[in-house]
C-alpha cells in the first residue's frame, strides 16, 4: 500500500505511569491491590454544562447510557481525595520534575507556570467526573535514530480507576489506580509508514523508561493512535496494548477508511439521499420461525422491528477490515448506544435460521429489499437503536465519521464513542497555578542526564555494533547484560550474543534457561574452560544444579590448552597443508578449540 499517495497522517499519544512515592494529587501510595476491598460506594454521574455553556458530544453520549458505578477502595491506601470528598493536594514534585526532564529530552518549550485543568470524563473511571491534567511543555523537536520526532504537547495527568467488572448498566471500578501520575506525550502528525511509526513509539517510550522513573509491568504503558488519510477523517484509536500491534492498527484503519469512502461513492452513484426513520414491526413474520436467535427474543416477550434502508443493497456486506463488514460497524453503534446485542441485515439473510420465505415476507411488508432487523423487549431501546442506525447510514453518505475507536487484539477496531470536543476541558479551581521553580529544574536536569543516544554510545564503546546495541536495548536483557559485563572478563559482544541469540533459540526449543546457567557459562568462558562455540551445546545439556564445567567434561567439550592446539595444528598442516588447515582444524575440533588459538598457532609455526 502506497501510504504517501494516500496522504496518511499518524499521531501518537503515549501514556506512561510514573514510579513515584505518592499519587499525583494526594499522598496515597501508588500500588495496585488484588485483596478484598474494605469498602464499596455507589455513584451516578450527571451532565453539567461548561462555564461557557457548551456541552461536549462525547460526554452527552456517555450520559445517555444511564449507568450506575460502584467504586472499591481500601482504608489504608485510599483517601477522601480519590472519593472526591476532599480537595486535591498540590501535585507531586517528583512527577513534575520527571515531566520537565522528558520535555527537555525532546527540546520542548516548558511553561513557566503550570495550570491544572479538569478534563470531563464521564465513563465512571474518575469519581469526580473529570480527570486532572496539566500541560507541561509544547513544540518539541528531536532527531533520534534517523527519525524526525515532533512533540506537540507533554502533559502530566492522573490515571483513571481500574475497571474490574461490567454487567448491564453497572460498572465496577477499583480506586487503587486512580491518581497514579501519568505522563502523556502527544506527537505531531507524521507521514511515516506503519512499521516506522512503531519504531517512533518505542523511541518515545524508551526515552521515559531510561530515566528509571517509569513504572514497569502490564498496563503501565498505553498507546493511542490517531489516523487519517486524504478524504477521510481523524480517527482516535484508544488502548493499543502492544507496540507490535501499531502497524496492523494503522494498516487496518487505512483499509477501513478507504472502504467507507468507496461505500460513500457507491451510494452517491446510486443516487441515495438522506434516509428518514421508517420502521415496521415484523414480529408476525416469525410466528413459526426456526431461528434460535429470533425465538429467544420472542419467548421473553420481545419483538422484531425492521428499519427500511432503501438503496443499501449489498452495502452492509462490504468488508471494511479483516473479518469485519459495514454491518459490523452498524452493530457496534447499536451495542454502544443501547443495551441491544446487535442487529441482522438483509445482506446476510437468509441465514441464522431465518428462511428465504421469511425474508420475502419482510420485503413484502417493507416495500424495499434492503433493511436492518432489530430485536428486543424494550420499545425505547428499539426506537433508539433504529435512530442510531439511520443516523450512521446518513453519515455514510458523507464518507468517514470522526470517531474514538477501541483496538481489538487482532489490530481491527470497534466504535467506542464520538470524538470529544473542546468543551470537555476547563480550569481546576481547587489548585493554584504552579511555578516551575529552580528546585524542580535542578531535579529535572539530574533525571535528563540519561538518554537513548547516550546508552547507544555506551554500548557501542564496549565493542557492540549499533544494530546489536539496539537489539539489546529493546530486549528485556539490558540490565542483566550490564551486570554480567561488570562481573565477568568475557568480551561484551559474546555476552550479548548469548543473551539475545543463543538463549532465545534454546528457549524456543523448550530448553529452560536460567540466570544461574548463564552465569555458570560465563564463568567457564572467563576461566577458558569452554570456547564460545561450545556455549550453545553446554546450555542445551545443562541440568539443574550442574555447572558448565561439569557439562563440558561430560560432553567432551572442555577447551583445549594452547599446547594441545599447536600439536593438532601441526598434524593437520602435515595432512592438508597450511591453506586448508584453519577450516579443517575447526571442523574436526569444533566446540573444543578457539579459532583465535588456531590462528595464533598457525602464525607462530608457519609464518
Curated annotation (Swiss-Prot):
HAMAP family assigned: GatE
Catalytic reaction list: L-glutamyl-tRNA(Gln) + L-glutamine + ATP + H2O = L-glutaminyl-tRNA(Gln) + L-glutamate + ADP + phosphate + H(+)
Keywords: ATP-binding, Ligase, Nucleotide-binding, Protein biosynthesis
EC class (word): ligase
The protein's name in its UniProt record: Glutamyl-tRNA(Gln) amidotransferase subunit E
GO molecular function terms listed in the Swiss-Prot or TrEMBL record: aminoacyl-tRNA ligase activity; ATP binding; glutaminyl-tRNA synthase (glutamine-hydrolyzing) activity
EC code: 6.3.5.-
Annotated GO CC locations: cytoplasm
Superkingdom in the source lineage: Archaea
Function: Allows the formation of correctly charged Gln-tRNA(Gln) through the transamidation of misacylated Glu-tRNA(Gln) in organisms which lack glutaminyl-tRNA synthetase. The reaction takes place in the presence of glutamine and ATP through an activated gamma-phospho-Glu-tRNA(Gln). The GatDE system is specific for glutamate and does not act on aspartate.
GO biological process: glutaminyl-tRNAGln biosynthesis via transamidation; translation
Family assignment from sequence similarity: Belongs to the GatB/GatE family. GatE subfamily.
Oligomer status and interactors: Heterodimer of GatD and GatE.
SUPFAM superfamilies on file: GAD domain-like (SSF55261), GatB/YqeY motif (SSF89095), Glutamine synthetase/guanido kinase (SSF55931)
